[in-house]
């Protein structure tokens, strides 16, 4: 099973809120996931990530999507 770190959308119309989750690559965007590793609020510009969980998933072969990878770089998540 290929695992991806990706965004799962929540919130209301024009008020998005995202969870950063570890999910099977074949699962739908808002479908089942394996674990929540963080959140992203684009309106506030805030990211809250459990970097230990992210490192554990990436060490086990999980690949972040391009969007999640750019969020990690922008908010300096993996360099802590």
UniProtKB/Swiss-Prot annotation:
A Pfam cross-reference name: Ribosomal_S16
GO process terms (BP): translation
Keywords, sorted A to Z: Ribonucleoprotein, Ribosomal protein
Any one GO molecular-function label of the UniProt entry: structural constituent of ribosome
Cystines in this chain: none
Gene Ontology CC terms: cytoplasm; small ribosomal subunit
Gene3D superfamilies for the chain: 3.30.1320.10
Domain of life: Bacteria
ATP-binding among keywords: no
PANTHER family reported for this sequence: 30S RIBOSOMAL PROTEIN S16, SMALL RIBOSOMAL SUBUNIT PROTEIN BS16M
Family recorded in the similarity comment: Belongs to the bacterial ribosomal protein bS16 family.
Protein name per the record: Small ribosomal subunit protein bS16
Gene this protein is translated from: rpsP
